[in-house]
Amino acid sequence: MLEIIKNLEHFGLSTNAARAYCSLLKSNPATGYEISSHAGIPRSAVYNVLSKLESMGLVSGMGEKPKRY
């Protein structure tokens, strides 16, 4: 998994974004809370990370409460 994260960082993703993306590859759909728990990203940062991944077209959100990715 570390090699995948390093490769994603090479393409411009932050460490947290790469970890969130890998978490979603393993289990999706998932809520921000679930992604935070699985990827080891602080909940205070996970939604900003997911928003960036959405704007890059790498993930898409669905639903309202709770939003799943």
Label each residue range with its predicted role:
Residues 57-58:
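Glycine-centered, phosphate/nucleic-acid-interacting loop/turn motifs that mediate DNA/RNA or nucleotide
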Residues 50-51:
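Short, hydrophobic-biased segments on the C-terminal half of alpha helices
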Residues 25-31:
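Short capping segments at the starts of secondary-structure elements
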Residues 17-24:
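Short alpha-helical "packing" element that flanks the helix-turn-helix/winged-helix DNA-binding module
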Residues 62-69:
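Short, Lys/Arg-rich nucleic-acid/phosphate-binding segment
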Residues 1-10:
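Short, Lys/Arg-enriched N-terminal segment that forms or immediately precedes the first helix
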Residues 34-39:
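A short acidic, leucine-rich amphipathic alpha-helix
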